[in-house]
């Protein structure tokens, strides 16, 4: 239980002066507390269980404190997914660093497939990813910023590879969406049929996506023959 917040907030919005109350500026610490509480609800019970009242109860904050940091529940939900995406991007970029564009794209694919195959990553991100995917149908505007963030490093490498001539003439944004669709389909299939061989799925998905980008067969073979990458985040949620 967060016992220090009521003391911090006892003057919330109460800097009185002639003409009324002066609005306080957002506090990054309180913003983080609200976001953390909301993320825990979404992660454990889903978006439908999230409410402003529940967040205020768990954080011991008042209504003014909430609306000083978020305009609405929808903005809070969008912020939860964006925060999750930013943490995921840190992990993906670690995997993609010091690689040429072809290997970086393969590393992004491999990193996202960790949702299905890496127990520690899956335990932290699976529920949030499922919730985000569900919201793509119910309320796409809430998760669009999060998806753009997760796709950003992939789009950057696709753009670079296109400029260097390592890919065929491609539309990086469109190809990133297509690659994400292939990866997510295989993640869901593995969750439904867990006996499938992870190594074979990784190889097949990477090969399929790289072929679609126009990568030469010998370059694909070289990528697939590389030793398994060191996976930052194994044994942790990041």
Task: Please state what every model-predicted region is.
Residues 116-138, 155, 222-226:
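Amphipathic alpha-helical segments used for helix-helix packing
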Residues 33, 41-75, 79, 83:
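Helix-turn-helix
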Residues 95-96, 123-133, 186-193:
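Secondary-structure edge/capping motif, primarily at the C-terminal ends of alpha-helices
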């Amino acid at each position: 239980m967060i016992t220090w917040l009521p003391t911090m907030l006892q003057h919330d919005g109460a800097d009185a002066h002639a003409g009324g109350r002066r609005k306080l500026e957002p506090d990054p610490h309180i913003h983080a507390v609200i976001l953390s509480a909301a993320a825990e609800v979404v992660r454990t019970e889903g978006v439908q269980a999230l409410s402003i009242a529940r967040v205020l109860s768990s954080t011991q904050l008042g209504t003014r404190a909430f609306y000083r940091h978020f305009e609405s529940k929808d903005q809070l939900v969008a912020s939860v997914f964006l925060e999750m995406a930013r943490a995921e991007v840190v992990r993906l970029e670690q995997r993609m660093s010091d690689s040429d564009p072809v290997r970086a794209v393969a590393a992004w694919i491999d990193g996202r497939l960790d949702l299905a195959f890496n127990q520690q990553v899956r335990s932290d991100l699976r529920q949030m990813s499922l919730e985000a995917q569900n919201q793509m149908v119910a309320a796409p505007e809430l998760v669009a910023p999060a998806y753009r963030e997760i796709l950003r490093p992939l789009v950057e490498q696709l753009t670079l590879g296109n400029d260097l001539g390592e890919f065929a003439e491609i539309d990086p944004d469109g190809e990133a969406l297509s690659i994400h669709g292939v990866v997510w389909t295989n993640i869901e299939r593995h969750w439904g049929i867990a006996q499938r061989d992870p190594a074979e799925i990784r190889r097949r998905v990477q090969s399929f996506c790289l072929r679609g980008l126009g990568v030469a067969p010998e370059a694909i073979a070289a990528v697939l023959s590389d030793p398994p990458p060191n996976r930052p985040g194994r044994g942790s949620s990041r």
